[in-house]
A protein has these predicted regions:
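Donor-nucleotide binding loops and adjacent catalytic segments primarily
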Residues: 1-61
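A donor-sugar binding/catalytic signature common to diverse glycosyltransferases
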Residues: 47-96
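C-terminal amphipathic helix plus adjacent low-complexity
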Residues: 113-170
């Protein structure tokens, strides 16, 4: 998925399709703009939307733009990530997931040779797989995370506000 803000995704999808073909892998391309996608072989599905929470646990890896939401969902699914950032916070997110050992960062243009090499590395690297599963195991479930957030907000509400008024009183 190139993300919702990518306006020129033709090269990304063309390169990804060639990389999947080279590796003999199936894939699912997600975009609301099918005009950006070249004709695809039957091994690659094109969909405008699929819930990542349903898709990722059944996936071997994820190639994406590096947005924080997609990155977090892949962490929760415990799968390797190949981030191809192009804007905003994506560069920082991609660098961080690489430093964590859960994936790789591949800057644009993400050509098919580089995509296939990086994806093959991620799919074969046992240390990356183990690191992804370890991070997944350390993540709180939605209910636990919500409970912790509520506890944090309630504790913060008990503390007096320091709005700087005391410094200005006189």
């Amino acid at each position: 998925t190139p993300g919702s803000t990518m306006l020129e995704g033709q090269g990304f999808f063309r390169g990804a399709a060639k990389a999947l073909r080279k590796l003999g892998r199936r894939g699912i391309f997600l975009t609301k703009d099918p005009a950006q996608v070249p004709p695809l072989p039957e091994e690659i599905l094109l969909r405008p939307y699929v819930p990542m929470s349903a898709l990722l646990p059944r996936s071997a890896a994820l190639v994406h733009h590096g947005g924080i939401g997609t990155t977090a969902l892949a962490f929760a699914a415990g799968i390797p990530q190949l981030a191809t950032p192009f804007a905003h916070d994506q560069f920082d997110n991609a660098t961080r997931l690489e430093r964590l050992g859960c994936g790789l960062r591949l800057d644009a243009p993400a050509e098919d040779a580089a995509l296939s090499e990086a994806l093959q590395h991620l799919l074969e690297d046992e240390q990356v797989a183990a690191t992804c599963k370890d991070l997944q195991a350390r993540m709180d479930s939605g209910a636990v995370a919500c409970a912790k957030a509520v506890d944090f907000v309630e504790a913060a509400a008990q503390r007096p506000l320091d709005n700087g008024a005391q410094a200005h009183a006189g």
